[in-house]
Each structure stands twice: as structure tokens, then as C-alpha cells.
């Protein structure tokens, strides 16, 4: 049905917990890379229900929500509506938000982000903080200072913050228009794509991605071959090209030998 496969998710969760003492789950949503899929509120209800049932075994479960692209997915409040649902999870399921400050504030090269713990008790939150302090120091020492200085200055200046928010909204709207153009054109061309909601990339199922990618290169079209498909970056091409590209890809996939 081209929606989140809750049944398979439940099977994987329960199967892994049967074989091991703890489980870490990473969900990249909204605006998943490389498909552009976003879990709906109904999807989140299923995730919470599955994890609540699975937690009955008493083992530790960590749900990591990789929300790096959340502020480029669409309306910022709308795409955060799933957050209260994480409060419904039982005590032995810890939720962690992986948030990218460098992406949200268009500072990609500075590589700055945050892990935000959503715990049911203060003891769990304190333990999470202690573990992160030690593991972070041992892995990369301190976070990028330049990014921290820039962000502190942005939040210390309301006018600058408003400018940054406006700039991000401009690029978010541009990205949404490109994604809409590509998906509409894909439908018109009969090009099958993985369900797309928002984001920087669109994925196309393909039996021989390397061959199709090589064929497209002959026409000056460069896309990334994946294990089972092709990845198109709608973030890197114009809206006009997003409308033209699906038909070109479809034609390449239908050539003899592909």
C-alpha cells in the first residue's frame, strides 16, 4: 500500500529482542534520506504501539529519531506534532532526537548537532547525560566551536534570528516546489518512485541502477546508483529540470538491455 510497513517493523523488533538483550532503532524522519518518506501521525501511533508491546519483555530499547531534515520538510509546527507521542512510551524505551543544527541553520560545513533525550524519569535522563559526556569526549572531544559561536550569536540577536528563519523558509519552499514538480512529472511519465513526502532526495526503484546511471551519463544526467534503485537530488537542480528529468529517466530505463 506504499505506506510504512508496520507489520515488518514489528517482526524485526520482536525478532531482534528475542536474540539480544537490548535494541537500538534509528528512524530517519521526516524527509528521509534518500527516499523523502515521512512517517505520518498514524505511522507513529503504530510505532509507539509496537514498541510498547515489545517493551513488555523488560529489555532496554532506544529509539533514535534522526530528524536532521525536519526544518526543511514543511511547516515546522506540523512536522513536530509526532513529538508528544514519544511521551507515551514506557520507561524502558528511551527516545533520542538526533537534531542537526548545521543543517537547520544552513551551516553544513560546520557539522554541529545535538542529541536530545526524552526520558520518563530524571534518573534515566541523568544517566544519559553522563554516558554522552564520557563517550563524546572519548570519540571526538569537543563539538565544533565555530558553529556554537555562530548559533549563540544568532539567538542573541532577534533581528538576525528572524533573518535566518526567513532565509531557511525561502529554501524550504524552493525545495518543496522542486519535489512537487518531480513527483508530478514522474506520475505523468509513468515513472515509479518510492513514496515521497518531502526532502532533498527522491528514490526510484531500478533492477540495474549501475547500467541505467551509466546510460544517463551519456546524456549529461548524473544521478546516484543505489543497491536497488537510483537517487535523484532535487535539491541540486532547478524546478524546470525537476519537471523534465522523470521522462528522461523513464526513457533510459526502457531502453533495450536495461
PLM regions with names:
Residues 1-258:
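PLP-dependent class I/II
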